[in-house]
From Swiss-Prot:
CDD domains: trans_reg_C (cd00383). Coiled coil: none annotated. It comes from the Bacteria. The keyword Mitochondrion does not apply. The main transcriptional regulator of the Salmonella pathogenicity island 1 (SPI1) gene expression. Activates the expression of invasion genes by a direct action at their promoters and also indirectly by increasing the level of invF. Also binds upstream of prgH and directly activates the expression of prgHIJK operon. TPR repeats lie at residues 372-405. This is Transcriptional regulator HilA. The keyword Transcription applies. SUPFAM superfamilies: C-terminal effector domain of the bipartite response regulators, TPR-like.
Length: 553
């Protein structure tokens, strides 16, 4: 029997050009039904599911014809018939034949699926553990509540510490359950065992106060609380019906624990602030150690290093080495992974290996023509190379696919400032703040700088107060210092000079040129400019377009 199931996902649709392929076996073109036989339909679905990747002839034969005795001629006739159904011509090739390899669908495809049903929410109360040390009990209680709160997207709602922290007696427990009616609660006590501890845990369903599970967990001395939290999470998965962590990413990342670390790391990476990138670096490094054979953490970690270098919070040369190591590791695990190839394309162009970088980007785009990641990396590459119009177009394509991508929005803001001027940049900055980047400190620092350049000092000072002091580092500090110069002129120079003296590797950071120009004068800035130019420094190619450096051009 064939392995192919014609209805793998209810209501799923593939959209390409003016065609819509439904999972009920129907094909529409301009809202008119097109007849497509079962075999041709099955082949088309497999090619579309492959998302631009090559599908071998053997795979198609196995999945569509199964155990039936057929040869390649049957597949060839099927492909021919499918091309006629799609009205292929020389200008509109849908199916590409790769001789000796198989077939590939080579047109942009959008997959439309109905929203996944939201998981049923299960409310959980975590009671303070009984321990000899009250302070340690409170600390552990806080850590477990904070850790398990990360599982909210998967249907677990944890009551906050402020509600449960004083719930220690039977009377307190019964009152809490009666007032808030959580679905489940966890209680526990810690018993010393030499240098280690035994944690005895009970999971109780509140309705009927039914004991679901008891377990003793040994905690070795100095073991982090996160390990206990992960073990509790696994127990909850077994005990509470309907709780389901992200099984797709679990299969890719080996375990629930590594999946949750990865998701937290990706979240921090996407926040795109100095503090969040530092947190992402820690989490993604931890994830790589937990799942050394998974591709996604290596790609995310490579992007994290590049972002930190761009933001001026990590040595650029060292960041490039680290990013390349992780991108190469990802390609070793899957040499056709488009995200890894796109990252290597960006890294090679930063190293002035333009031909290699271009080929890698081309390959990545062929494998994944509608990837927000690839669009962002390529737009970033074009921006750094000084191709502003092309960069803006590509970044806009990225934002259409992923409107919430903070890094792409901020890149677009820089391009707009360089390409069409400060007024357009201020308008775009206000637009981004009203959408997805309300509190992003990089965006705020850029707006402060733009407003200061326009002489709107009071508004700039007001906006500066919205930036957290823990985020004022790297490029954010540079932007705010330049704004201070615009506002206070000569009075700001001592602070700027002090900042420049404290910066390491100033000779490898073209992003400091605007401050060098105002603090040390045109002669010293021009000397740095020529040095970067002679070195063919691509970070310099990004900064030499800055309107503030027009004197040095």
């Amino acid at each position: 029997m064939p392995h192919f199931n014609p209805v793998p996902v209810s209501n799923k649709k593939f959209v390409f050009d003016d065609f819509i392929l439904n999972m009920d076996g129907s094909l529409l073109r301009s809202e008119k039904k097109v007849n497509i036989p079962p075999k041709e339909y099955a082949v088309l679905v497999i090619l579309l599911e492959a998302a631009g990747k090559i599908v071998s002839k053997n795979t198609l034969l196995d999945q569509v014809w199964g155990d039936a005795e057929v040869n390649e001629e049957s597949l060839t006739r099927c492909i021919y018939a499918l091309r006629r159904i799609l009205s292929e011509d020389k200008e509109h090739r849908y199916i590409e034949t790769l001789y000796g390899q198989g077939y590939r669908f080579n047109r942009p495809v959008v997959v439309v699926s109905p929203p996944a049903p939201q998981p049923t929410t299960h409310t959980l109360a975590i009671l303070p553990f009984q321990m000899q040390d009250q302070v340690q009990s409170e600390s552990l209680h806080y850590s477990i509540v904070k850790g398990l709160s990360q599982y909210a997207p998967f249907g677990l709602s944890v009551l906050p510490v402020t509600i449960t922290k004083n719930c220690r007696s039977v009377k307190d427990i019964l009152e809490l359950m009666d007032q808030l009616r959580p679905d489940y609660y966890i209680s526990g006590q810690m018993i010393p065992d030499g240098n280690d501890n035994i944690v005895q845990i009970e999971i109780v369903r509140v309705k009927g106060y039914h004991l679901l599970h008891q377990e003793s967990i040994k905690l070795i001395e100095h073991q982090p609380a996160s390990l206990l939290q992960n073990k509790i999470a696994n127990l909850l998965l077994r005990c509470i019906p309907g709780l389901r962590w992200d099984t797709k990413q679990i299969s890719e990342l080996n375990s629930i624990d590594s999946t949750m670390v990865y998701l937290r790391g990706k979240h921090e990476l996407n926040q795109y602030t100095p503090y969040s990138l530092q947190q992402a670096l820690k989490l993604l490094t931890q994830c790589v150690n937990m799942s050394p054979n998974s591709i996604a953490p290596y790609c995310a970690l490579a992007e994290c290093y590049l972002s930190m270098a761009q933001m001026g919070i990590f040595d650029k040369q060292n960041a490039m080495i680290k990013a390349k190591e992780h991108a190469i590791k990802a390609t070793e695990l899957d040499h056709n992974n488009p995200q890894a190839l796109g990252l290597l394309g960006l890294i090679n162009t930063i190293h002035s290996e333009y031909i290699v970088g271009s080929l890698l980007f081309k390959q990545a785009n062929l494998l994944s023509p509608i990837s927000a990641d690839i669009k962002y990396y390529y737009g970033w590459n074009l921006f750094m190379a000084g191709q502003l119009e092309e960069a803006l177009q590509t970044i806009n394509e990225c934002l259409k696919l992923d409107p919430t991508r903070a890094a792409a929005g901020i890149t677009k803001l820089w391009i707009t400032y360089y390409h069409t001027g400060i007024d357009d940049a201020i308008r775009l900055g206000d637009e981004l703040r009203s959408q997805h980047l309300q509190d992003n400190p990089i965006l705020l620092s850029m707006q402060v700088m733009f407003l200061s350049l326009k002489g709107k000092h009071e508004l700039a000072r007001k906006l500066t107060k919205e930036i957290s002091t823990q985020e004022i580092t790297g490029l954010i500090a540079v932007n705010l210092l330049y704004a201070e110069y615009c506002q206070n002129s000569e009075r700001a120079l001592p602070t700027i000079r002090e900042f420049l003296e404290s910066e390491q590797r100033i000779d490898n950071n073209p992003g400091l040129l605007p401050l060098v120009l105002v603090a040390h004068g045109e002669a010293i800035a021009e000397k740095m400019w020529n040095k970067f130019k002679n070195e063919d420094n691509i970070w310099f190619k990004r900064w030499k377009q800055d309107p503030r450096l027009i004197k040095l051009r």
